[in-house]
Amino acid sequence: MISTIEEESDGAIDVYNGSESETGAIIEIEFDADASTIEIKNTTTGDDLKLAYAFQTGDKVIVNTNKGMKSITLIRAGVLSNIFSSLQQGSTFFQLVIGNNHFEYLVDGIPNTEDVSIIFRYYNLYRGV
């Protein structure tokens, strides 16, 4: 089952992982204005992911943090591009811990809810027998 959490207010999102184990996420970021950096920080774990790129209004970025499937894809005017190289040094492809994960995000270094829309999707993982 896939769970979806859309952005909340004030540059913050709470994502509750009801799985029986940690899981990766698929993060969709849609830019409503030009930007040069975006940082998504899991304040629950201290992990963060920072991208630096010449983002344009209308760009969509899809970040996959699932183990074995890590990717960063830009969709611009219907064209898909691999922008893995935009990942900044020290960034982490974080996993969602069991329970609540509090995320804050910065666009060009400031909390911003006007210039981006963010959606988290993740699989609920259950341990087998």
Model-inferred region functions:
Residues 1-129:
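Intrinsically disordered, low-complexity segments enriched in serine, threonine, and glycine
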